[in-house]
Amino acid sequence: MKIILIIFALFLNISYSYADQNSPKLDELFSQLSQVKDSKEQSLIISKIWGEWMKIENPDVKIVMDNISDFFKSKNYQSAISALTLAIELEPNYAEAYNKRATFYFMMGDYENSMRDIEATLYLEPRHFGALDGLSRILISYKNYDGALKVYQEMKKLMPNDLSVDMKIENLNQMVSKET
């Protein structure tokens, strides 16, 4: 029933334009992220970036985005994809809708569609570390360790002091060296 209400709400309004990745706060937040050394402070900055990415003025798309966690909890991935597809039709320049849909495709094992949405996300927001991480995970599943390593090295430029990125790079370096 909830999905029907969300889909109905999407058809009520069609012309809004503010998109997440255009937030004037993001440049400053990414600057802070590139310099932060404290992990708690880093987590706070990352949370603020996600908050900016999630913002959308279109109330119909906002309904979808506000209900993403419900789709995850219920494992209703196909309904999530349908709702996000409608959101993307309403706001085709909203990077986070593509990113969330890519995540649901990934969880369903549909890496091809996930990759398409990751590409759209990164086209709209090249600094989207969530999409970069998703891309790396897909490359790893295809055993393209060198490609995944390159993606994490790009993430490292955005998050130079992130220990989890360091660990992923270290693990991938080992996997790449085993292949040669």
Task: Tell me what each language-model feature is.
Residues 40-43, 57, 129-130, 158-170:
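Boundary/linker segments of alpha-helical solenoid repeat arrays
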Residues 17-66:
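N-terminal leader/linker segments that initiate helical-solenoid repeat arrays
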Residues 73, 107-108, 141-142, 158, ...:
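Register position in tetratricopeptide repeats
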Residues 33-37, 50, 88, 122, ...:
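A conserved position within tetratricopeptide repeats
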Residues 58-125, 130:
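Alpha-helical adaptor scaffolds
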Residues 38, 42, 54-61, 144-150, ...:
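Alpha-helical linker/edge segments of TPR/alpha-solenoid repeat scaffolds
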